[in-house]
UniProtKB/Swiss-Prot annotation:
This is Ribosomal RNA small subunit methyltransferase G. GO terms for molecular function: rRNA (guanine-N7-)-methyltransferase activity. The gene is rsmG. Its EC number is 2.1.1.-. It is found in: Cytoplasm.
């Protein structure tokens, strides 16, 4: 059943990676009994609401080796951990201000033998490392997110696509747009035909392209 959902939407995934996704679920299930890392309700739909949701980035973006990605407000390690398993030559920096979550993520990194993931217990306001892409999942309203992270971008692009923000959100988008920037909006339901994704959006903001 678990393998089937990945084979349906991501048929090119290696079986060894799928096994690690299953292991990731088991780790979360174990620790969630003691610490509320993700909601218990979403744990019942773990592969759909956490893994598939994270992997929708992979449908659009391919990160080249040695790219640097910052995952802001990573929570239980999403979308950073699933993407780090796919792009194992890309550097992922996962940040969250809640120490207990960071401790669990460190354990996950060890259990999954991830060599390309680094964690920091801090707020993005106080974090000044530079990167190619910043990922967030329903952290705050998009204009506020842009304001918080724009200091963290490298100006020189490394990938075929421009450096930018990769943001997963639900609900409306038009009232959050900043007309200074170029956005590409993807309806996740177009490539993940699950009811959960009906109103979910993937927003790609191209950081170093401004509309004057």
């Amino acid at each position: 059943m678990k393998e089937r959902i990945f084979n349906k939407y991501f048929p090119d995934l290696d079986k060894s990676i799928i096994k690690k996704f299953i292991k990731l679920y088991k780790i979360h299930k174990f620790f969630n009994k003691k610490i509320n890392i993700i909601s218990n309700n979403s744990l019942n739909f773990f592969y759909e609401r956490h893994i598939l949701h994270s992997l929708c980035v992979y449908k659009i973006c391919y990160f080249l080796n040695k790219s640097i990605i910052i995952d802001v407000g990573t929570g239980g390690g999403f979308p950073g951990i699933p993407l780090a398993l796919l792009f194992n030559k890309t550097k992922f920096i996962l940040i969250d201000s809640i120490e207990k979550k960071i401790k669990i993520i460190n354990l996950i990194i060890k259990e999954l033998h991830l060599k390309n993931v680094y964690v920091k217990c801090t707020r993005i306001e106080n974090f000044h490392n530079k990167c190619n892409f910043i990922i967030g999942r329903a952290v705050t309203k998009l204009p506020n997110f842009i304001r918080l992270v724009k200091k963290n971008f490298l100006f020189k692009k490394k990938n075929k696509i421009n450096n930018g923000i990769l943001y997963l959100k639900g609900g409306e988008f038009e009232n959050e747009k900043n007309n200074q920037y170029l956005y590409i909006k993807y309806n996740i339901y177009n490539f993940l035909k699950k009811f959960f994704f009906k109103k979910k959006l993937f927003i790609f903001l191209l950081f170093n392209i401004k509309i004057i």
